[in-house]
């Protein structure tokens, strides 16, 4: 009414017309903004999702930085919050024997296989707030939209959101604990793997009131017959979408990955009394090997004989090869002591499994050669290996259609004029790799600023968060909602 009072005095009938126009046009617009009547559900898919991302990002074991590892105190607090959000979306919730959080809607009398949507709740050390969390919260928000619009009850197949307890592998140096357990590929021996403090996986499970037995581990496994597909939303962790000025992209496959641990033992001694020529210094050997790895992965043709080693290397197969030394530890780690032992990690990734396997073999051979030259003892342990994972073509096509529908319906500021939805390869490992052993998988990437990830500088625009959630709503609508019932209800 304040707006009407500012107008010149008019005949009462004019005021009635204005009020009628207000009621007919302005109120539905306001209602649409509040309840999603515009079909875009901004308040749930953008505003509430971003607030929840920030809330989860504050739950940390670190002081002043984000760290949330497998079943840590912060992980337990985060689980309680995620469960409350799942219940808010109308889902039935539970925690399995590997600490994964599940939220599921089960249609009455449905015999169809479930659609699983998930990502991981753990983080690296000094992490950003989007890696993993975005996939979980976007999925919960999408199902909340279905709940508030009455479409949740029209689902024709079960839809389940899973927040996996561990993907990064920070605490136990073994990735995909959560998703591999669900896929049924986690060996019983994992229970005896220990962290840096000597605490085993079994110890941690029992400390958190879980059984920590082989039988309990088997209970986590889903049967392939009960699952139709798995979909994961994740930040790109690369710069391609930003360069293309596009908020979303579909993933055609995930690079294979191998993690190694190199252990070098030399002669510990006094930094001032042992002559240089008489030293057996593992630090120098480690430094040389780090540079050797860099050269091997930058210029593999200098080390590999194509015909003998593989017979299949091409410019394309070698293009996605990347190698990283991310951790180096020395003992006793004192400034005036020649180290007695140096350990470092190696991460090797490639789109072509033959390339990756050959690089692993070649580097392991070079480690032994360099250590012999330096008169130090060494060993190479393989800690993790995962084959490249292709995404299901039909699932990818459906995600692409949902993405295209999303982008065309959003505001002009979110769209890039023309062009098709980008199709990307992922150089990073994801829970979808483990879940591919259970069912067909698909992935949706979300643009992140500068391609930065595993860093507090990780950043995603609010509207891109919105786009990801809306794409999931559209995907679920197209693949799990009774279209005939939905049309009848809306009419």
Swiss-Prot record:
GO terms for biological process: allantoin catabolic process; purine nucleobase catabolic process; ureide catabolic process. Binds 2 manganese ions per subunit. The keyword Metal-binding applies. It comes from the Eukaryota. GO terms for cellular component: endoplasmic reticulum. Mn(2+) 2 binds at residues 131, 168, 454. GO terms for molecular function: allantoate deiminase activity; metal ion binding. Gene3D superfamilies: 3.30.70.360, Zn peptidases (3.40.630.10). Involved in the catabolism of purine nucleotides. The sequential activity of AAH, UGLYAH and UAH allows a complete purine breakdown without the intermediate generation of urea. Homodimer. Belongs to the peptidase M20A family. This is Probable allantoate deiminase. It comes from Oryza sativa subsp. japonica (Rice).
């Amino acid at each position: 009414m304040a707006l009407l009072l500012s107008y010149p005095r008019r005949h009462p009938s004019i005021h009635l017309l204005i009020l009628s126009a207000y009621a007919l046009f302005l109120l539905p617009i306001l209602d649409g903004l509040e309840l999603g009547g515009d079909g875009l559900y901004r308040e749930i898919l953008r505003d509430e999702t971003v607030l929840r991302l920030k809330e989860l990002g504050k739950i940390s074991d670190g002081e002043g930085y984000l760290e949330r590892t497998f079943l840590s105190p912060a992980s337990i607090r985060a689980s309680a919050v995620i469960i409350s959000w799942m219940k808010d979306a109308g889902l039935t919730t539970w925690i399995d024997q590997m600490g994964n959080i599940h939220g599921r809607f089960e249609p009455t009398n449905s015999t169809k296989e479930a659609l699983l949507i998930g990502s991981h709740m753990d983080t690296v050390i000094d992490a950003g707030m989007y890696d993993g969390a975005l996939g979980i919260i976007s999925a919960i928000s999408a199902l909340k939209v279905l709940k508030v619009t009455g479409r949740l009850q029209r689902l024709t197949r079960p839809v389940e959101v899973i927040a996996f307890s561990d993907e990064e592998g920070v605490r136990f140096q073994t990735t995909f604990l959560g998703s591999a357990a669900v896929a049924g590929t986690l060996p019983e021996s994992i229970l005896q793997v220990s962290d840096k403090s000597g605490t085993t996986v079994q110890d941690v499970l029992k400390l958190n009131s879980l059984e920590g037995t082989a039988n309990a581990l088997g209970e986590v496994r889903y049967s392939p017959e009960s699952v139709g597909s798995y979909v994961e939303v994740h930040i790109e962790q690369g710069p391609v979408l930003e360069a293309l000025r596009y908020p979303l992209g579909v993933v055609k496959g995930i690079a294979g990955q191998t993690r190694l641990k190199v252990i070098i033992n030399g002669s510990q001694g006094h930094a001032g009394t042992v002559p240089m020529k008489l030293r057996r210094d593992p630090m120098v050997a480690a430094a040389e090997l780090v540079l050797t790895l860099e050269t091997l992965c930058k210029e593999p043709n200098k080390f590999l004989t194509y015909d003998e080693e593989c017979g299949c290397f091409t410019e394309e197969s070698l293009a996605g090869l990347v190698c990283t030394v991310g951790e180096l530890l020395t003992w006793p780690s004192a400034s005036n002591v020649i180290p007695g032992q140096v350990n470092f990690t190696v991460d090797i990734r490639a789109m072509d499994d033959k390339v990756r396997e050959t690089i692993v073999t070649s580097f392991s051979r070079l480690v032994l050669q360099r250590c012999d030259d330096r008169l130090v003892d060494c060993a190479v342990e393989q800690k993790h290996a995962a084959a490249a994972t292709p995404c299901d073509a039909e699932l990818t096509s459906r995600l692409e259609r949902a993405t295209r529908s999303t982008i065309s319906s959003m505001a002009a500021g979110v769209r890039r004029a023309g062009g098709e939805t980008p199709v990307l390869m992922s150089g990073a490992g994801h829970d979808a790799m483990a879940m591919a052993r259970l069912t067909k998988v698909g992935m949706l990437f979300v643009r992140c600023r500068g391609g930065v990830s595993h860093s507090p500088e990780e950043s995603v625009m609010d509207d891109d968060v919105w786009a990801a959630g809306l794409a999931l709503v559209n995907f679920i609508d197209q693949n799990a909602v009774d279209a005939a019932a939905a049309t009848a209800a809306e009419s």
